[in-house]
Amino acid sequence: MDGLGRDVQGEGALLRGQGEAVRVVLPGGVGAWAVTDPAVIRELLTDGRVSKDAYRHWPAWQRGEVGAEWPLAVWVSVQNLVTSYGAEHRRLRGLMGSAFTARRVGLLGPRVGEIAAGLLEGMEAAAREARGGVVDVRGLYAQPLPSRVMLELFGIPEEFRGALREIIEGFFATGVSLEDARRNYAALYRTMGELVAFKRRRPGEDLTSALIAAGSGADPADPGAPSDLADLTDVAGGVGAGGPEAPGGGGLSEKELVDNLIMLLSAGCEPTVNLLANAVVLLLREPGQLELVRSGRASWRDVVEEALRVEAPGANAILRYAVEDVRVGETVIPRGDALVIGFAAAGRDPGVHGEDAERFDVMRATRREHLSFGHGVHYCLGAPLARLEAEIALQALFDRFPGMRLAVEPGALRPTESFISNGPREVPVLLGPPTDGVR
């Protein structure tokens, strides 16, 4: 698979055409099975014989055949809610869910609107100064909006924010060198450790403080920031060791706290950036679809769901592992083999969405039948927040700039350099005359 993600959808279509489970080679020469069929994905993601815990269920990782030198090691070496399995996952999910409540998310709606309004003011000002009036909607709106929402949700002070935004963007780049991956992870771990220490001294009404409270009574020893990925196995408990012991009483250890904060923050930013950027491109490329919303025949929720389907913000999810032999159609995936779940390819499956599955259609009957937030026990905790942000942000943008158009041909847009993260690197637009934003 192309680590630079130069044609995520083309690669997905190729894999779909080759069967329900296809052998692939990941960046760095690691073999895996790619699964793109929606029905098969749903089965696998609810099958107890499929795990996300490399320390327990991936022999290649346990034996050191794949290790810290692998450029994608950070995706499997961290131990958090996303990479947990079984009882451990249920424990962490309960703790995360107790902090990431529907009430806390719901209260963010007005603040999302305020952040959007401020960013739109800034983008309009930037357009007045820009050559030809061209501005990048991704860089000036889609990227900072979810970042600011998450930074506020986490109660992150201003002095941490700039560094975290840069680090998180680098985290999703799968075409980077090993040295860059090591440096980025070390910086992320160090910064989040500093944040936890700050919040212990000055707790507030925020997600970080809530998770610290959930982990109270856990081992207070600070493992320190790993200097590079080679230190991850020691910090996490050693290759094959199963990771850190759960603290007494089922709380969070210091390592678990930092790892899960990293997971929540990164998962809450980059995918929503892609969702917003993709939706903007799709609407500007298909103005008839935007008119359906403006005429009241479709809603902004319809736009969000169809954008999630046709351009999944997370193209591929790595990795899962067969706990025992698993049959997929005529293929048997042997115990211990790794799997890649192709969410972007699944979203365009013609067997589910029709022969025009690649077309953006906000009235499509199957627009909600996507897997872009996952499925089963690992369904994304932040899905309600991502939907809330996208609906508010898209309506605010198109209400404010009803004449906005792409400044380049759609084919000239460059993808992010990743086969995991799926979205454009920039979205250059001409805003057109603004309105007062009231409709």
Regions of interest found by a model, annotated:
Residues 1-439:
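Cytochrome P450
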